[in-house]
Amino acid sequence: MTEIITKANTNQYQTGAAAILLACILWGTTGTAASFTQAVSPLATGAFAMGVGGLLQALLAGKIIAYQRRQLWQFRSALLCSALALAVYPLAFYTSMQLAGVAVGTVVSIASAPFFTVLIERLFGKGLSISRRWWQSFATGALGIALLAGAKTPMHAQSGSDYLFGIALGLVAGLAYAIYSWVAKAMIVQGVKSQAAVGAIFALGALLLLPSLALTGENLFANPLNSSIALYMAVFPMCVGYLLFGYGLRHVEVHNANLLTLFEPVVASLLAVWIVGETISLLGWLGIALIGGCLVMQSQQKGAE
C-alpha cells in the first residue's frame, strides 16, 4: 500500500512538473515577441498582457471563485499582497528586459525567484525543510544561469547605469514573482482550488494594472503587428501559462516549482538565437546543459520532501 501511495505521489509530482515546464515554454516566448513591437513602452506591454490575461483567467474561473468566495475572503490580506506583487512583476520584468537585454533581464528575474521563495518560506512558512537535493540542483541551475547570462550578447548595447538598473529591476521582478507563487500555494494547500486562487489574484492584479494603460498605452494598437503581439501575450503566456502553473502548484512545492521555472530563460535564449539572431558562446551552451541537469533532478523528485 505504501508503495502504491508513493508511486501515485511521484506521478502527481511529475505531472505537475510537466505542466510548469510547459508554462515556461509559453513564458519564454514573451521577450522575443515583445522585441518585435514598434514604439511600445515595456510598461504598456506588461500591463496589457498581465491585465487582460488576468481578466481572462478570472472569467474562466468565475464559477469557482463565486463558489469559494467565503474561503477567498478569509485570505483577503494575502490576496491583496499577492495582487500587488503580481502588478509589480510585469512592469519590472519587461522594463528589465529593455534595459539589460532580453536574455539578461529574463535570467535575473527568473533565477532570483527561487532564492526569494526559500527566504519567504523560512521567514513566514511553517519550518519547511529544504532538502540537500534541492540545494544541489539549485547550485547546478544557478551556475548554468550565470554562464548563460555571461555568455549572452544583448541585442542592444546599454549604458552601464541602465544595465545595472535593469538588473535591479530583474531582482524586483523575482521577488514579486516569489511572493505571488508563495501566496497562491499557501491558499491551495489550505483548501482553495487552484483556479479560484490564481483567478482571484489575477483579477485583482488586473484592476491595478489596466488603468495604467491610460498613461503608457500609446502605440499599443497602432498597427496589426503590435496588436497581434499584445493579444498573443495576453491569451497564451499570461492566461494559459499561468493556468498551467496554477495546476502544477497543486502537486509541486513552491520552492521546487520556482526552481523548475529556470527553464524559461533557456527557452528565451534559444528563441533569441533562432528568431532574433543573437548568439550564444560555448560557455552559454554549457550553461544550458547545466540548467537541463537541474531540471532533470527536480522533475524526478517526489511530491513531498
Specify the residue positions occupied by each region the protein language model found.
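Hydrophobic alpha-helical transmembrane segments of multi-pass integral membrane proteins
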Residues: 14-19, 44-60, 135-143, 165-172, ...
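Hydrophobic transmembrane alpha-helices of multi-pass small-molecule transport proteins
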Residues: 57, 131-152, 271, 283-302
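Glycine-/small-residue-enriched transmembrane alpha-helix faces in small-molecule transporters
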Residues: 1-53, 84, 88-92, 156-186
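Specific transmembrane alpha-helical segments of multi-pass solute transporters/efflux pumps
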Residues: 62-105, 109, 146-147, 234-252
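Hydrophobic/aromatic residues within transmembrane alpha-helices
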Residues: 37, 45, 96, 123-126, ...
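Helix-helix packing/entry segments at the starts of transmembrane helices
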Residues: 48, 105-112, 183-206, 238-274
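C-terminal transmembrane-helix exit sites in multi-pass transporters
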Residues: 60-64, 113-136, 266-286
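Membrane-interface helix termini and inter-helical loops of multi-pass transporters
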Residues: 32-40, 98, 149-163, 213-230, ...
